[in-house]
Protein backbone atom coordinates (compact mmCIF):
# COMPACT_ATOMS: atom_id res chain seq x y z
CA UNK A 1 0.00 0.00 0.00
CA UNK A 2 1.34 3.44 -0.91
CA UNK A 3 1.67 6.28 1.59
CA UNK A 4 -0.65 8.23 -0.70
CA UNK A 5 -3.23 5.44 -0.53
CA UNK A 6 -3.04 5.41 3.25
CA UNK A 7 -3.69 9.15 3.30
CA UNK A 8 -6.69 8.84 1.00
CA UNK A 9 -8.19 5.94 2.95
CA UNK A 10 -8.13 8.11 6.07
CA UNK A 11 -9.90 10.87 4.15
CA UNK A 12 -12.76 8.69 2.84
CA UNK A 13 -15.56 7.66 5.21
CA UNK A 14 -15.82 3.86 5.25
CA UNK A 15 -19.63 3.79 5.38
CA UNK A 16 -20.81 6.80 3.38
CA UNK A 17 -17.94 6.77 0.90
CA UNK A 18 -17.72 10.55 1.10
CA UNK A 19 -14.34 12.28 1.05
CA UNK A 20 -13.65 14.58 3.98
CA UNK A 21 -13.19 18.30 3.41
CA UNK A 22 -9.39 18.20 3.46
CA UNK A 23 -7.31 21.32 2.95
CA UNK A 24 -5.60 20.89 -0.45
CA UNK A 25 -6.19 17.13 -0.63
CA UNK A 26 -4.76 16.77 -4.13
CA UNK A 27 -1.54 18.55 -3.17
CA UNK A 28 -1.06 16.40 -0.07
CA UNK A 29 -1.66 13.23 -2.08
CA UNK A 30 0.85 14.45 -4.66
CA UNK A 31 3.48 14.97 -1.96
CA UNK A 32 2.82 11.48 -0.69
CA UNK A 33 3.26 10.09 -4.21
CA UNK A 34 6.57 11.91 -4.48
CA UNK A 35 7.69 10.20 -1.28
CA UNK A 36 6.41 6.89 -2.66
CA UNK A 37 8.54 7.34 -5.79
CA UNK A 38 11.62 7.85 -3.65
CA UNK A 39 10.77 4.81 -1.52
CA UNK A 40 10.48 2.76 -4.72
CA UNK A 41 14.01 3.87 -5.72
CA UNK A 42 12.65 5.69 -8.75
CA UNK A 43 14.06 9.13 -7.96
CA UNK A 44 16.90 11.06 -6.34
CA UNK A 45 17.01 14.70 -5.28
CA UNK A 46 19.43 17.31 -6.59
CA UNK A 47 20.20 20.45 -4.61
CA UNK A 48 18.51 19.21 -1.44
CA UNK A 49 19.81 20.13 2.03
CA UNK A 50 21.82 17.46 3.78
CA UNK A 51 21.46 15.94 7.24
CA UNK A 52 22.10 18.56 9.91
CA UNK A 53 20.69 21.38 7.78
CA UNK A 54 19.16 24.36 9.54
CA UNK A 55 15.41 24.88 9.73
CA UNK A 56 15.66 27.65 7.11
CA UNK A 57 17.56 25.34 4.75
CA UNK A 58 15.04 22.54 5.26
CA UNK A 59 12.16 24.88 4.47
CA UNK A 60 13.74 25.50 1.04
CA UNK A 61 13.92 21.79 0.26
CA UNK A 62 10.92 22.14 -2.02
CA UNK A 63 13.20 23.96 -4.48
CA UNK A 64 15.31 20.83 -5.01
CA UNK A 65 14.97 19.15 -8.39
CA UNK A 66 14.01 15.53 -8.98
CA UNK A 67 16.24 13.16 -10.93
CA UNK A 68 14.45 10.09 -12.27
CA UNK A 69 16.83 7.15 -11.92
CA UNK A 70 14.46 4.43 -13.14
CA UNK A 71 11.74 5.27 -15.65
CA UNK A 72 10.31 1.75 -15.94
CA UNK A 73 6.55 1.71 -15.24
CA UNK A 74 5.47 0.38 -11.86
CA UNK A 75 2.06 -0.83 -13.00
CA UNK A 76 0.33 1.46 -10.51
CA UNK A 77 -1.71 4.14 -12.29
CA UNK A 78 -1.10 6.89 -9.71
CA UNK A 79 2.59 6.15 -9.21
CA UNK A 80 3.22 5.97 -12.95
CA UNK A 81 1.43 9.29 -13.50
CA UNK A 82 3.62 10.85 -10.80
CA UNK A 83 6.72 9.35 -12.41
CA UNK A 84 5.70 10.79 -15.78
CA UNK A 85 5.20 14.23 -14.22
CA UNK A 86 8.78 14.12 -12.93
CA UNK A 87 10.05 12.98 -16.35
CA UNK A 88 8.17 15.77 -18.12
CA UNK A 89 9.83 18.52 -16.06
CA UNK A 90 13.39 17.40 -15.23
CA UNK A 91 14.60 20.86 -14.22
CA UNK A 92 11.51 21.98 -12.32
CA UNK A 93 11.60 22.35 -8.53
CA UNK A 94 9.91 19.63 -6.51
CA UNK A 95 7.05 21.93 -5.55
CA UNK A 96 6.18 22.37 -9.24
CA UNK A 97 6.17 18.61 -9.70
CA UNK A 98 3.79 18.35 -6.75
CA UNK A 99 1.46 20.83 -8.46
CA UNK A 100 1.49 18.77 -11.65
CA UNK A 101 0.88 15.46 -9.87
CA UNK A 102 -1.96 16.95 -7.82
CA UNK A 103 -4.17 17.46 -10.88
CA UNK A 104 -5.22 13.79 -11.08
CA UNK A 105 -3.74 12.24 -7.93
CA UNK A 106 -7.06 11.63 -6.15
CA UNK A 107 -8.77 10.18 -9.23
CA UNK A 108 -5.89 7.81 -9.96
CA UNK A 109 -5.56 6.64 -6.36
CA UNK A 110 -9.29 5.97 -6.04
CA UNK A 111 -9.20 3.92 -9.24
CA UNK A 112 -6.28 1.87 -7.90
CA UNK A 113 -8.00 1.21 -4.58
CA UNK A 114 -11.19 0.10 -6.34
CA UNK A 115 -9.24 -2.17 -8.67
CA UNK A 116 -7.61 -3.92 -5.71
CA UNK A 117 -10.92 -4.34 -3.86
CA UNK A 118 -10.15 -1.94 -1.02
CA UNK A 119 -12.93 0.50 -1.98
CA UNK A 120 -16.14 0.18 -3.96
CA UNK A 121 -17.36 2.69 -6.52
CA UNK A 122 -21.05 3.56 -6.14
CA UNK A 123 -22.71 5.88 -8.63
CA UNK A 124 -26.14 7.44 -8.18
CA UNK A 125 -28.06 10.60 -9.01
CA UNK A 126 -29.15 13.30 -6.63
CA UNK A 127 -32.73 14.41 -7.32
CA UNK A 128 -32.55 12.05 -10.33
CA UNK A 129 -30.39 14.60 -12.10
CA UNK A 130 -27.00 15.28 -10.51
CA UNK A 131 -24.48 12.42 -10.74
CA UNK A 132 -22.93 11.46 -7.40
CA UNK A 133 -20.05 9.05 -6.83
CA UNK A 134 -19.22 7.52 -3.46
CA UNK A 135 -16.33 5.26 -2.42
CA UNK A 136 -17.36 3.11 0.59
CA UNK A 137 -14.96 0.55 2.02
CA UNK A 138 -14.96 -2.96 0.58
CA UNK A 139 -12.10 -4.21 2.76
CA UNK A 140 -11.16 -2.06 5.76
CA UNK A 141 -8.60 -4.43 7.32
CA UNK A 142 -5.59 -2.39 6.20
CA UNK A 143 -7.07 0.90 7.37
CA UNK A 144 -7.92 -0.61 10.76
CA UNK A 145 -4.31 -1.67 11.24
CA UNK A 146 -3.10 1.72 10.00
CA UNK A 147 -5.25 3.60 12.49
CA UNK A 148 -3.92 1.42 15.30
CA UNK A 149 -0.34 2.25 14.30
CA UNK A 150 -1.10 5.97 14.13
CA UNK A 151 -2.76 5.87 17.55
CA UNK A 152 0.34 4.29 19.08
CA UNK A 153 2.46 7.14 17.73
CA UNK A 154 0.07 10.06 18.24
CA UNK A 155 -1.37 9.06 21.61
CA UNK A 156 0.91 6.49 23.22
CA UNK A 157 4.14 8.24 22.25
CA UNK A 158 5.69 5.45 20.16
CA UNK A 159 8.46 6.53 17.78
CA UNK A 160 7.35 6.45 14.12
CA UNK A 161 9.31 4.73 11.40
CA UNK A 162 10.06 6.81 8.30
CA UNK A 163 6.90 5.76 6.49
CA UNK A 164 4.59 6.54 9.41
CA UNK A 165 6.44 9.78 10.13
CA UNK A 166 6.02 10.86 6.52
CA UNK A 167 2.30 10.12 6.58
CA UNK A 168 1.82 12.04 9.83
CA UNK A 169 3.81 15.00 8.47
CA UNK A 170 1.53 15.12 5.44
CA UNK A 171 -1.60 14.68 7.58
CA UNK A 172 -0.51 17.57 9.82
CA UNK A 173 -2.62 20.61 9.01
CA UNK A 174 -5.07 18.63 6.87
CA UNK A 175 -7.80 18.48 9.50
CA UNK A 176 -7.73 14.67 9.62
CA UNK A 177 -5.60 14.14 12.74
CA UNK A 178 -8.46 14.88 15.13
CA UNK A 179 -10.64 12.21 13.55
CA UNK A 180 -8.09 9.47 14.21
CA UNK A 181 -8.50 9.57 18.00
CA UNK A 182 -11.14 10.20 20.63
CA UNK A 183 -12.29 13.72 21.43
CA UNK A 184 -10.37 13.87 24.70
CA UNK A 185 -7.15 12.89 22.91
CA UNK A 186 -7.33 15.28 19.98
CA UNK A 187 -5.21 18.08 21.43
CA UNK A 188 -2.43 15.68 22.40
CA UNK A 189 -2.55 13.98 19.00
CA UNK A 190 -2.39 17.28 17.14
CA UNK A 191 0.53 18.43 19.28
CA UNK A 192 2.34 15.16 18.62
CA UNK A 193 1.72 15.48 14.87
CA UNK A 194 3.11 19.00 14.93
CA UNK A 195 6.18 17.75 16.78
CA UNK A 196 6.79 15.02 14.20
CA UNK A 197 6.17 17.34 11.25
CA UNK A 198 8.73 19.81 12.61
CA UNK A 199 11.33 17.23 13.61
CA UNK A 200 14.95 17.35 12.59
CA UNK A 201 16.17 16.48 9.10
CA UNK A 202 17.59 13.15 10.19
CA UNK A 203 14.17 11.64 10.95
CA UNK A 204 13.63 10.74 7.28
CA UNK A 205 15.60 10.41 4.08
CA UNK A 206 16.47 13.50 2.08
CA UNK A 207 14.01 12.49 -0.64
CA UNK A 208 11.16 12.12 1.82
CA UNK A 209 11.90 15.45 3.48
CA UNK A 210 11.96 17.13 0.07
CA UNK A 211 8.54 15.63 -0.69
CA UNK A 212 7.17 16.95 2.60
CA UNK A 213 8.75 20.40 2.14
CA UNK A 214 7.45 20.64 -1.42
CA UNK A 215 3.95 19.76 -0.22
CA UNK A 216 4.02 22.35 2.57
CA UNK A 217 5.28 25.02 0.17
CA UNK A 218 2.62 24.19 -2.42
CA UNK A 219 -0.18 24.15 0.18
CA UNK A 220 0.96 27.58 1.36
CA UNK A 221 1.06 28.92 -2.21
CA UNK A 222 -2.39 27.56 -3.02
CA UNK A 223 -3.71 28.99 0.24
CA UNK A 224 -2.39 32.47 -0.52
CA UNK A 225 -3.81 32.33 -4.04
CA UNK A 226 -7.21 31.25 -2.72
CA UNK A 227 -7.20 33.99 -0.11
CA UNK A 228 -6.29 36.58 -2.74
CA UNK A 229 -9.11 35.34 -4.97
CA UNK A 230 -11.61 35.62 -2.13
CA UNK A 231 -10.44 39.13 -1.25
CA UNK A 232 -10.59 40.23 -4.87
CA UNK A 233 -14.04 38.69 -5.25
CA UNK A 234 -15.27 40.46 -2.13
CA UNK A 235 -13.83 43.76 -3.34
CA UNK A 236 -15.53 43.28 -6.70
CA UNK A 237 -18.83 42.53 -4.98
CA UNK A 238 -18.52 45.65 -2.85
CA UNK A 239 -17.69 47.72 -5.91
CA UNK A 240 -20.72 46.35 -7.70
CA UNK A 241 -22.93 47.09 -4.71
CA UNK A 242 -21.77 50.71 -4.48
CA UNK A 243 -21.52 51.47 -8.19
CA UNK A 244 -23.81 54.18 -9.55
CA UNK A 245 -25.84 53.02 -12.57
CA UNK A 246 -25.06 54.81 -15.81
CA UNK A 247 -28.72 55.69 -16.24
CA UNK A 248 -30.36 56.33 -12.88
CA UNK A 249 -33.85 54.95 -12.37
CA UNK A 250 -36.61 56.89 -10.60
CA UNK A 251 -36.22 56.97 -6.82
CA UNK A 252 -39.09 54.57 -6.20
CA UNK A 253 -37.75 51.96 -8.60
CA UNK A 254 -35.55 49.18 -7.17
CA UNK A 255 -31.84 49.66 -7.71
CA UNK A 256 -30.26 46.90 -9.82
Where are these regions (language model features)?
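Short, structured motif recognition centered on aromatic/hydrophobic residues
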Residues: 34-37, 109, 113, 166-175
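Short, amphipathic alpha-helical interaction segments positioned at domain boundaries
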Residues: 61-108, 128-166, 177
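Short hydrophobic helical membrane-anchoring segments positioned at the boundary
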Residues: 151-256
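Short glycine-centered helix-capping/turn motifs at secondary-structure transition points
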Residues: 41, 117, 175-179
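Short acidic alpha-helical/loop segments enriched in Asp/Glu that coordinate divalent cations
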Residues: 120-129
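Charged/polar, solvent-exposed surface patches and flexible loops
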Residues: 9, 81-88, 99, 111, ...
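Short, amphipathic alpha-helical interface elements at domain boundaries
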Residues: 1-105, 229-256
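Amphipathic, coiled-coil-like alpha-helical scaffolding segments used for oligomerization/assembly
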Residues: 107-121
Amino acid sequence: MLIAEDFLLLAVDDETGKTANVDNLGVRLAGALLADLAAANKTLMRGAPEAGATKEEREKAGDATILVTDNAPTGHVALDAALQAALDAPDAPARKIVEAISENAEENLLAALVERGVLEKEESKLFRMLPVTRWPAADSSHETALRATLTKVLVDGAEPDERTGTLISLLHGSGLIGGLVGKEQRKAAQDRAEEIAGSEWGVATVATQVAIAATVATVATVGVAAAAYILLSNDADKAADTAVPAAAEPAEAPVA
